[in-house]
């Protein structure tokens, strides 16, 4: 049985009408676009399908509005990582309506309006629903197959169902998550194809086993690549795991070779065991390569510190001598050995500004003048040793720079002089992305609404 997952339909009110489609009947939507040439489109949902559709519609000159019930797009990402995606789409001219739940749809002549909670109606020539999928289990129910808590078909490692001689694979089966061990639904083509091979082997008398998946995924959104594997922070917290996180912004290849592009990486590992729990990467080049290495290391059971020793291919056009994956291992080892302590963007607002701690920004004056975190005083790294006598002893020192490297070096200088210091994870670039996204959400107005 190779049941699929079915796109969720619209909430009422919302009769099936000409102006909207779900990705499950994409040929209908494609012919609608070709026939009617819509000028505006509203997309409900913020996952893979919605974003890929949004990109293609925008390329055709359609004005796109994306509605998402939660504060971010791309649920496999944490909010802080998703902010880079939000900024990219806004720069492409798309309208993001986050924290906006669709309550229904209303047909008005040739226009369809998305009705959002709170009463607002958003008119468009085309509406596309991509608000998630549910397992297609109707046949499984008729056949008396056992279903799991998520509505998927229960199978063992041989892909056998609860009924002898019936095998099931694909989107509608519940499989073990390789990180948590809990059964889950992973609607991706990679796992489905591997399950099919296992089932076929066993049907033909073999003894193959499918152990599970960790949800490795990648998607192209305009010029940006977004990838994830394993757990994000939300999932790790829900699983009750104690974890540490590492954020870095390396170049896709050696900095002295032209054309390198920044990527932002976030890696989670379990405290104590150092077990890799998950990774997220957003960038332009080399994203898929790094997520695949991290996914392989996770499935192989490597501890996070083992990443520093991976012998990865290097040439200036493709990588750095210390690959971004190696850097994750170096940074984790520094944390585990107590070489450095860190703080995160969500900690910044709670830092006292009463003089009981010292807040330093180790960037250049030019970088600092372009924006800084409140209360952080500019002492460039190259001048830090000249100003050590001006930094109050006995007070914790929190240090920030653009990416996290110079602030780390500043922390090493300070620690060697007896200071208790903390390095900002991800750098000001990461912090600024989160703050800009929050500011935009608080100050943005729907199209056609005048600012007061």
Residues covered by each model-derived region:
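Residue-level detector of alpha-helix initiation sites
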Residues: 10-12, 32, 48, 80, ...
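Short hydrophobic core segments
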Residues: 1-9, 44, 122-132, 196, ...
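Rossmann-like dinucleotide-binding cores of NAD(P)H-dependent redox enzymes
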Residues: 48-106, 187-192, 209-235, 434, ...
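Mid-to-C-terminal Rossmann-like scaffold of FAD/NAD(P)H-dependent oxidoreductases
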Residues: 172-285, 316-320, 324-350, 357
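Rhodanese-like catalytic fold shared by cysteine-dependent sulfurtransferases
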Residues: 305-316, 320-357, 365-396, 402-452
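A Rossmann-like FAD-binding core segment of flavoenzymes
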Residues: 60-157, 447-452
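Glycine-rich dinucleotide-binding loop and its adjacent helix/turn
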Residues: 8-62, 95, 149, 155-157, ...
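FAD-site-proximal beta/loop scaffold in flavoenzymes
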Residues: 23-38, 120-201, 293, 297
């Amino acid at each position: 049985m190779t049941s699929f997952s079915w796109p969720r339909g619209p909430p009422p009110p919302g009769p099936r009408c000409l102006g909207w489609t779900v990705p499950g009947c994409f040929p209908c939507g494609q012919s609608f676009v070709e026939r009617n040439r819509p000028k505006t489109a509203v997309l409900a949902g913020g996952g893979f399908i919605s974003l890929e559709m949004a990109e293609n519609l925008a390329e055709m000159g359609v004005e796109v509005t994306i509605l998402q019930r939660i504060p971010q797009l791309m649920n496999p990402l944490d909010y802080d990582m998703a902010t880079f995606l939000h900024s990219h789409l806004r720069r492409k001219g798309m309208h993001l309506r986050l924290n906006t739940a669709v309550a229904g749809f209303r047909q008005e002549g040739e226009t369809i309006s998305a009705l959002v909670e709170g009463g607002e109606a958003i008119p468009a020539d085309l509406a596309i629903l991509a608000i998630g999928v549910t397992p297609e289990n109707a046949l499984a129910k008729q056949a008396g197959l056992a279903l799991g808590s998520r509505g998927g078909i229960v199978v063992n490692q041989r892909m056998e169902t609860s009924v002898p001689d019936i095998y099931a694979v694909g989107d509608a089966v519940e499989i073990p998550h390789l990180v948590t061990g809990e059964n889950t639904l992973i609607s991706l083509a990679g796992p489905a194809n591997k399950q099919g091979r296992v089932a076929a082997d066993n049907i033909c008398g073999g003894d193959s086993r499918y152990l599970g998946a960790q949800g490795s995924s990648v998607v192209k959104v305009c010029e940006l690549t977004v990838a994830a594997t394993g757990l994000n922070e939300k999932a790790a917290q829900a699983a009750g795991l104690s974890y540490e996180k590492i954020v870095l912004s390396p170049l896709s290849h050696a900095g002295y070779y032209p054309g390198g592009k920044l990527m932002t990486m976030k890696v989670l590992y379990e405290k104590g065991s150092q077990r890799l729990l998950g990774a997220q990467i957003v960038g332009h080049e080399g994203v898929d390569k790094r997520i695949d290495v991290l996914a392989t290391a996770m499935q192989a059971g490597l501890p996070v510190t083992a990443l520093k020793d991976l012998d990865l291919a290097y040439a200036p056009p493709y990588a750095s001598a210390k690959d971004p994956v190696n850097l994750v291992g170096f940074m984790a080892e520094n944390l585990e050995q107590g070489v450095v302590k860190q703080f995160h963007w969500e900690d910044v607002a709670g830092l006292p500004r009463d003089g009981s701690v010292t807040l330093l920004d180790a960037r250049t004056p030019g970088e600092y003048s372009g924006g800084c975190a409140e209360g952080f005083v500019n002492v460039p790294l190259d001048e830090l040793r000249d100003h050590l006598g001006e930094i109050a002893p006995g007070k914790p020192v929190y240090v920030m720079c653009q990416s996290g490297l110079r602030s780390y070096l500043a922390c090493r200088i300070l620690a060697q002089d007896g200071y208790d210091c903390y390095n900002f994870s991800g750098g000001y670039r990461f912090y600024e992305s989160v703050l800009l996204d929050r500011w935009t959400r608080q100050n943005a107005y729907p199209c056609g609404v005048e600012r007061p």
